[in-house]
Amino acid sequence: WATDGHKWLNVPYDSGYAFIAHPAAHFKTFTSQAGYLKEDGKARDEYNWTPELSRRARGYTTYAVIKELGSTGIENLVERCCRHAAAIVEGAGQLPHTEVLAYPIINQGLLRFKNPLGGDVESLHDQFTEQVIAAINASGEAFFQPSTFKRKRCMRVSVSGWRTNEEDVRRT
């Protein structure tokens, strides 16, 4: 399986991880054979385990975060982000002209904003949703991205910042 360290651990953007059940297959896939790349066989050389020769040190940032937070800290971070996402979606979902398209399963949910002028014209709701997202982002209070779900424009609520707190959620 694979996961993204950027989202949950707030490490550099290109820190993804793949957990492989068969080390020999993993090694064979990524091994770089060249005459000038010598191995003494005494220690694992990371260039044989990553897609690019230039990424050997990428794991240090992840190691530092895991060492600092520990398993309990990581668990608390993930649970807090999930709780904040749910609170934002549930709170916003109670506002007039707001429709919850997807409640968070983990840390992401989807909201749609219906044009208060009425009507069932989807394009008007799409436009209004885009306007609401632009206004929120322009305020600087929060940042959301637009998305499309089942042909409806919506606002993607995604919480993964370790500094996000209850006051941020309340203001949002």
Residue ranges and their predicted role:
Residues 149-172:
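PLP-dependent enzyme catalytic core of the Aspartate aminotransferase-like
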Residues 2-95:
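Active-site C-terminal subdomain of aminotransferase-like
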Residues 7, 68-71, 115-117, 161-165:
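A generic structural motif
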Residues 103, 108, 138-156:
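Conserved PLP cofactor-binding pocket of PLP-dependent enzymes
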Residues 64-65, 110-115, 155-160:
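Short, hydrophobic beta-strand segments
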Residues 87, 91-95, 131-142:
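Generic non-transmembrane alpha-helical segments
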